[in-house]
């Protein structure tokens, strides 16, 4: 079967089996095309909480599927590709952060959504890159322990100088590998292009950007801008989606290093096989984990508006 035929089979199966498909924006175009909802982590979290179907199929990474299960515990949630983890989410665990909390008892723990369900159970609030500044700004606490991404934490701290931040050494290895030298090379090659970067990038890269924002923020900025040429400083799929959506504009990836192997692990055939019952993985979380982890996600949605 070709791509179009597989997509049609998927559309038939998801209707037949009452499945809602969620796809992160870093997924390949052919996967996003068959999804009911696409977007960044924050949007997908909100979407997951409103799903009416009996089943949810996540095309993304494990923590995203766990978040779906936490927000919709009565649904059966599947991860299309079981091997799709997140290197950032695996950097810190509940035991480690419990020890850090003892060192800083007067600090509120703000967890990037790129964390495991188990770790979320001891955090005060979750944030995404699109909601972090707003949420932390709305928190009454002045002292913030921000985990795990130190680059995003640095970005948020600079927007909110009235708060005290403690950052740990964690982050996205894909975004963090981008350097100021990469930026200089790209700007020299495309001198008329605006640079749009994700706050998971190093501060030295963020400081050189024309716009800093989440994946959704970057896409909205580029689509609505009067400018016609952009350098995209986040996962390569965003540049590809933008080029498809805005054929009259030019999009260049900042560096070819911006490819997330975990996000690219999911294929259209994985989605098809999961719907057939021949692949994927059902996400199972115990009731206590769901109850405890849901508190910080609910707080994210409440403070994020």
Q: What kind of feature is each model-predicted range?
A:
Residues 1-232, 238-305:
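Active-site loop-to-helix "anion-binding N-cap" substructures in soluble metabolic enzymes
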């Amino acid at each position: 079967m070709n791509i179009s035929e597989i997509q049609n089979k998927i559309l038939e199966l998801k209707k037949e089996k009452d499945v809602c498909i969620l796809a992160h924006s870093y997924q390949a175009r052919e996967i996003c095309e068959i999804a009911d909802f696409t977007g960044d982590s924050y949007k997908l979290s909100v979407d997951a909480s409103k799903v009416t179907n009996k089943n949810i199929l996540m095309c993304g990474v494990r923590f995203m599927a766990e978040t779906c299960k936490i927000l919709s515990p009565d649904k059966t949630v599947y991860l299309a590709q079981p091997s799709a983890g997140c290197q950032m989410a695996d950097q810190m665990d509940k035991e480690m952060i419990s020890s850090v909390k003892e060192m800083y008892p007067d600090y509120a723990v703000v967890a990037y959504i790129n964390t495991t369900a188990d770790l979320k159970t001891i955090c005060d609030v979750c944030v995404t890159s699109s909601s972090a500044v707003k949420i932390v700004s709305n928190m009454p606490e002045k002292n913030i322990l921000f985990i795990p991404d130190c680059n995003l934490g640095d970005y948020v701290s600079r927007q909110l100088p009235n708060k005290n931040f403690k950052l740990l050494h964690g982050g996205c290895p894909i975004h963090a590998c981008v350097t100021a030298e990469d930026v200089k090379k790209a700007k020299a090659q495309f001198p008329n292009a605006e640079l749009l970067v994700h706050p998971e990038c190093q501060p030295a890269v963020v400081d050189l950007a024309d716009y800093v924002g989440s994946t959704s923020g970057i896409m909205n900025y580029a689509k609505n801008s009067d400018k016609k040429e952009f350098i995209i400083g986040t996962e390569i799929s965003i540049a590809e989606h933008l080029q498809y959506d805005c054929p009259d504009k030019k999009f260049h990836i900042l560096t070819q290093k911006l490819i997330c192997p975990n996000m690219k692990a999911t294929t259209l055939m994985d989605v098809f096989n999961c719907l057939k019952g021949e692949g994927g993985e059902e996400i199972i979380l115990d009731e206590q984990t769901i109850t405890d982890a849901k508190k910080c996600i609910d707080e994210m949605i409440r403070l994020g508006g």
